[in-house]
Curated annotation (Swiss-Prot):
The protein, known as: Small ribosomal subunit protein bS18
Swiss-Prot/TrEMBL GO biological process terms: translation
Keyword Ribonucleoprotein: yes
The species this protein was found in: Deinococcus deserti (strain DSM 17065 / CIP 109153 / LMG 22923 / VCD115)
Gene3D superfamilies, A to Z: Ribosomal protein S18
Lineage, broadest ranks: Bacteria, Thermotogati, Deinococcota, Deinococci, Deinococcales
Disulfide cross-links: none
One Pfam assignment: Ribosomal_S18
Length: 92
């Protein structure tokens, strides 16, 4: 005896209720931060992932102009060995 799969029994996947997301605000536009110097490693680390990659705009919430400036600043800091190019990957 074979079982027939009834499509009415299945639940659609990924069709849950959508939560409204809080819009990301560019911290440079509101004056919270300023791209002043490549030597400010503490500020630059906010825009670098744990593995050392530059975070994309959708994660940082920066405008296109500020994303380009922060990327250039991070690259300068990497060349001067203030920031690492990659972090050591630790598998758990």
């Amino acid at each position: 005896m074979t079982q027939q799969s009834n499509s009415a029994d299945r639940k659609p996947r990924g069709k849950g209720p959508k939560r409204p997301r809080k819009p990301k605000v560019d911290p440079f536009s509101i004056g919270e931060l300023e791209i002043t110097d490549y030597k400010d490693v503490k500020m630059l680390r906010r825009f670098v992932s744990d593995t050392g990659k530059i975070l994309p705009r959708r994660r940082t919430g920066l405008s296109a102009k500020h994303q380009r400036r922060i990327a250039q600043t991070i690259k300068v800091a990497r060349q001067l060995a203030l920031l690492p190019y990659t972090e050591k990957l630790v598998r758990k």
